[in-house]
Design a protein with these regions (language model features):
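Class I S-adenosyl-L-methionine-dependent methyltransferase catalytic core
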Residues: 1-63, 67-357
Length: 357
């Protein structure tokens, strides 16, 4: 087959979305539930390791995510819709310049998704790993345990995003409250909840921005999220989206980020924790420092920092970050800020700041 024929046959098949059939989804869900999460938790170094269990399940409910812009980068959907780019990407698979070399008839949908995500100049929106979220809930939140006399705690996820933390909450067995303004995302989250949520636990999903969600006093056992990065991922055009509603970074910091942190403070029980996963990027060079300062202004005490181990691609030299792909050594040199990463070769880390009320 020549490249045009390969291109045309894929276009005829349609975009390689994740499967949506019940059997496939149930298999992935069971892998997530049966995964031994304690293997991810390194309490000595305060590191949460990485595993992708359950991530594909979240993505299978979020087909719109393939077309969401990150800064000026191209989306995977834009590559798919451009004959020249798509042909180039297919050529990389056929010639083995990008991945393992494969003949046309052996190329899978998974190969296609990988190529579309990693095509030069392309960035796909990020999702939180369900296993990492569940591990955080394991560390910070009580579960239903007749033996220990505890009942399942309630967590709030201010920026639900694409379902990684919701699936983590389901896997960990905690009650979950979530907020997010994006309509198609919200619809996907409702389906995840309806299909996989435990009947005896509560999942309250709210389509609104976290700055407008006022929890009841002392109603929360843990607040945990990865807030949006001002103006980086254009999640949707809803007027409630934080970077549409607050058009300057100062306004966004004050009215969105600080207000969300204040809402968390109001809702948390005394002695309980807020955990925020943020990282400095080229677009926002002081996101970490600003987040810690704002939390302190609200009244929190910064008691700890846990580290999320992020994916390093092929051979540990290329690293996927919120900024796009970079090499590990470059990433180490690039990091500007006061929160020094654990020095473990072949791995990249992002902080999750822990604040106590």
């Amino acid at each position: 087959m020549n490249i045009k024929e390969v291109h045309d046959s894929w276009k005829e098949k349609g975009f390689p979305y994740y499967p949506t059939d019940t059997k496939w989804r149930n298999d992935i869900f069971n892998q997530l539930i049966n995964f031994k999460r304690d293997t991810l938790i390194d309490r000595k170094n305060k590191i949460i390791g990485q595993s992708a269990h359950g991530l594909n399940l979240a993505w299978s409910y979020m087909p719109h995510a393939w077309g969401i812009k990150c800064g000026k980068m191209k989306t995977p959907m834009e590559i798919w819709e451009d004959e020249e780019h798509l042909s180039k990407g297919l050529n990389k698979i056929l010639s083995g310049t990008f991945f393992m070399k494969k003949p046309a008839h052996m190329i899978t949908e998974s190969d296609m998704r990988s190529m579309l995500r990693r095509y030069s100049g392309t960035q796909m929106v990020s999702n939180f790993r369900p296993t990492a979220a569940a591990a955080m809930y394991d560390i910070f939140v009580d579960k239903d345990s007749p033996l220990e006399g505890t009942t399942a705690g309630t967590v709030w996820d201010p920026s639900m995003g694409y379902g990684g933390r919701l699936l983590g909450a389901i896997a960990a067995g905690v009650n979950y409250i979530g907020t997010d303004p994006c309509i198609p995302t919200y619809e996907g989250l409702e389906k995840i909840r309806d299909e996989y949520g435990h009947k005896h636990l509560k999942y309250s999903l709210n389509r609104q921005g976290s700055e407008t969600f006022i929890p009841e006093d002392e109603s929360l056992d843990f607040v945990f999220t990865s807030p949006p990065y001002f103006g980086w991922e254009a999640y949707g055009d809803e007027p409630e989206q934080s970077s549409i509603k607050f058009s300057t970074s100062d306004m966004w910091k004050e009215k969105f980020l600080k207000q969300t942190i204040a809402n968390a403070y109001k809702g948390l029980k005394k002695g309980k924790y807020l955990a925020l996963n943020v990282a400095n990027t080229k677009q926002y060079k002081t996101f970490e420092e600003d987040t810690v300062d704002l939390a302190k202004e609200v009244g929190f005490e910064h008691t700890d920092t846990w580290w999320l181990s992020l994916s390093t691609q092929q051979g540990g030299s290329a690293v996927s970050t919120l900024d796009g792909d970079t090499t590990e050594t470059k990433q180490k040199q690039q990091y500007m800020g006061k929160y020094t990463r654990p020095n473990i070769s072949g791995r990249k880390f992002e902080p999750t700041f822990i604040f106590k009320k």
